[in-house]
């Protein structure tokens, strides 16, 4: 995929940061020495970590140059590293690995979570939040439009960009086997947006990227118009024109024994 767009992502900065704050609130650590923000994006979650743990050595890691440029401008005193999470290995065992809205882009969660858990210092925590919305209308309709002419051939692989999440039982079993105690929960946020275009703008910064990147500008516009029309049928507006977007997310905090 093309590089991420920090400005597009931050159009909904408050809504995207709230789950990170909710995840951090459940991390049972008082004074970790080493904290790594995996998939730190533009630094919104990193700022929360720095505020919660002011004495920790906090590192932000991301594969997007655009996201990292924004993060470095926001938090010049923090160390940010450009790296692919799939092959990342820390120099020293971290006390906290914090992964807000990033692991859904990576495959093999059984192997991935076991590998991350093994990186932790004894007593350390892996804290993860992932969107769990692939069966919401916002995402089902992406796939439906992608399967229609004239997009189908070019977007045949787009739906595979996101990993389908496991069940609570799966994540508990995988992390328990890796020597962790596990705290799991699921929350559905309900976001009021300014019409159906608001949903388009939201997912354009994340979930729509695999569907738009293979298309030229004219076909992108055609795809978005058809997608927005489908959203209008799936999300009836409120009396004042607002549209409510339910957004389920899966959370886990695993602590190494």
UniProtKB/Swiss-Prot annotation:
Its BP terms in the Gene Ontology are: methylation
Signal peptide extent = none
User: Carries keyword S-adenosyl-L-methionine?
Assistant: yes
**Where in or outside the cell is it found?**
Cytoplasm
MF-aspect GO terms: trans-aconitate 2-methyltransferase activity
Q: Which Gene3D superfamilies match?
A: S-adenosyl-L-methionine-dependent methyltransferases (1.10.150.290), Vaccinia Virus protein VP39 (3.40.50.150)
SUPFAM superfamilies annotated for this entry? Answer: S-adenosyl-L-methionine-dependent methyltransferases
Q: Which domain of life is it from?
A: Bacteria
What's its EC? 2.1.1.144
Q: Does the keyword Acetylation apply?
A: no
Q: Give me the Gene Ontology terms describing cellular component.
A: cytoplasm
- Provide the top EC class: transferase
Record key words, sorted: Cytoplasm, Methyltransferase, S-adenosyl-L-methionine, Transferase
Q: Name one Pfam family in it.
A: Methyltransf_25
Instruction: Fetch the InterPro entries from UniProt.
Output: Methyltransf_25 (IPR041698), SAM-dependent_MTases_sf (IPR029063), Trans-aconitate_MeTrfase (IPR023506), Trans_acon_MeTrfase_C (IPR023149)
List all disulphide bridges recorded for this chain.
none
Which transformation does this protein catalyse, written as a reaction? Answer: trans-aconitate + S-adenosyl-L-methionine = (E)-3-(methoxycarbonyl)pent-2-enedioate + S-adenosyl-L-homocysteine
Q: Function, please?
A: Catalyzes the S-adenosylmethionine monomethyl esterification of trans-aconitate.
Family the entry assigns:
Belongs to the methyltransferase superfamily. Tam family.
Please name the PANTHER family in this protein's record. Answer: TRANS-ACONITATE 2-METHYLTRANSFERASE, TRANS-ACONITATE 2-METHYLTRANSFERASE-RELATED
This chain belongs to the protein called: Trans-aconitate 2-methyltransferase
Q: What is the native source organism of this protein?
A: Methylobacterium sp. (strain 4-46)
User: Lineage of the source organism?
Assistant: Bacteria, Pseudomonadati, Pseudomonadota, Alphaproteobacteria, Hyphomicrobiales
